[in-house]
């Protein structure tokens, strides 16, 4: 913890093409070894594939997919009297977005298509239709929280 007050959170700049901070966060998460240009190309190419396959606006599909992936609840381990309980907690908006992007990329990287842009496009299209591995991860997280609802009174 800092001794001198609160540290200001750095804000990301909106991306040049769609003017969206969420897309910038997606690009930053795709990026490996500081190669932002490559990450941008992957992201924008995936958006083009989405527009081509779905016939809808890529940004619209992306937003729908993100809403279908972002979790509302999660469980957090809490140790009480020698026993560890999985306590369900609400997810803050910032963390919801981060988890959504993280789960989407993990699911996309595990897919079978040839290039990352095809995998990302496929996962986003699946997520916008409420299918796919990232949506399953969200459902599993919600089921876990629902199953442990009895321990909600141990909340932080």
Swiss-Prot record:
InterPro entries: Ribosomal_uS7 (IPR000235), Ribosomal_uS7_bac/org-type (IPR005717), Ribosomal_uS7_CS (IPR020606), Ribosomal_uS7_dom (IPR023798), Ribosomal_uS7_dom_sf (IPR036823). One of its GO terms (biological process) is translation. The keyword RNA-binding applies. PROSITE patterns: RIBOSOMAL_S7. GO terms for molecular function: rRNA binding; structural constituent of ribosome; tRNA binding. Keywords: Ribonucleoprotein, Ribosomal protein, RNA-binding, rRNA-binding, tRNA-binding. GO terms for cellular component: small ribosomal subunit. NCBIfam families: rpsG_bact. One of the primary rRNA binding proteins, it binds directly to 16S rRNA where it nucleates assembly of the head domain of the 30S subunit. Is located at the subunit interface close to the decoding center, probably blocks exit of the E-site tRNA. Part of the 30S ribosomal subunit. Contacts proteins S9 and S11. Belongs to the universal ribosomal protein uS7 family. This is Small ribosomal subunit protein uS7. The gene is rpsG.
